[in-house]
Amino acid sequence: MTTIRKNHPLFKAANSALIDLPAPASLSSLWNFGSLLGLCLISQIATGLFLAMHYAPETSSAFASVAHICRDVNYGWLIRNMHANGASFFFVCIYIHIGRGLYYGSYLYKETWNIGVVLLLLVMMTAFVGYVLPWGQMSFWGATVITNLLSAVPYIGESLVQWLWGGFAVDNATLTRFFAFHFLLPFVILALTLIHLIFLHETGSNNPLGLPSNSDKIPFHPYYTIKDIFGFLVLLFTLISLALFAPNLLGDPDNFTPANSMVTPAHIKPEWYFLFAYAILRSIPNKLGGVIALLCSILVLLVVPILHTSKHRSLTFRPVTQFLFWLLIADVLVLTWIGGMPVEAPYIITGQIASALYFSLFLILMPMASWVENKMLTW
């Protein structure tokens, strides 16, 4: 069996990635979230495939087809709830995964980090087009508002929006192409995930100390496979519990109303996992400025490796930057809260302060703190 595992052209690739892979001995549970993201992706593709078998991507029947799935298809309600709430769990895992990368300096593996940022953008795009498919009020108006941001692009903006819509408004052509994108993109994400892993296995994993661990490695199986399986069980138990006991907890009540272009909801907002970026978009009073800020809220992650000035890799031994890191986490939570609030005082000014702090932490405060800590090492 060992000979087949190590010599067979197919099995030896899996063996070197999942069984005999040398891994640092000190990885904490924060390193579980990469494999949990893989589980979320497989779960979303599986449930999405079954939903696509019964879904009708047509404006007159899309809303009814989702109701049909929940009422008439065997376990359709469970598949739909698993898929809708699975997206939320996907983003929880992504944000913790990125937070771990920022805290422990994993971004210094630049190729892996950059592919990860591209993956984040693709997952966000997939989730956005997926949210439009049930064709409820928030689906329709969310699609209208967010796609309309392209009109801020100078000179070609209006043409871009009409090209994306397939007409002069969000309508049947838009829904059909969004369904096509939502079906296709997860497979692109799957391919990029493999590239992400290939780059990771070129360098090996980072560890909580941020120190080279070449002298202290253990085989991935059985130590980390058991740890990952435990993580899988916790995630699946939590996801199934949410899907069974509170399936609509994270959704928007407006999406239970079929899309109506003549009635605008009182407060248009995206799903909770986009609210921090939505708050940054709204905090700029200029349309083009808001779109640029929205893009930069994600693309700022690409600048993090360039601005790393510390002599230490991880934040484990850097108390000043640690404080700023937790300030960033608090700031993102505040932005998430603001994104769900109406555009009125005191939320406007709070959102603007939180947005300014978000970019300041990444671009100014954290690099400055690293410089101060480097000086402190020489005292």
From Swiss-Prot:
CDD domains: cytochrome_b_C, Cytochrome_b_N. InterPro entries: Cyt_b/b6_C, Cyt_b/b6_C_sf, Cyt_b/b6_N, Cytb/b6-like_sf, Cytochrome_b, Cytochrome_b_C_euk/bac, Cytochrome_b_N_euk/bac, Di-haem_cyt_TM. The chain crosses the membrane at residues 33-53, 77-98, 113-133, 178-198, 226-246, 288-308, 320-340, 347-367. Heme b b566 binds at H97, H196. Component of the ubiquinol-cytochrome c reductase complex (complex III or cytochrome b-c1 complex) that is part of the mitochondrial respiratory chain. The b-c1 complex mediates electron transfer from ubiquinol to cytochrome c. Contributes to the generation of a proton gradient across the mitochondrial membrane that is then used for ATP synthesis. Belongs to the cytochrome b family. The cytochrome bc1 complex contains 3 respiratory subunits (MT-CYB, CYC1 and UQCRFS1), 2 core proteins (UQCRC1 and UQCRC2) and probably 6 low-molecular weight proteins. This is Cytochrome b.
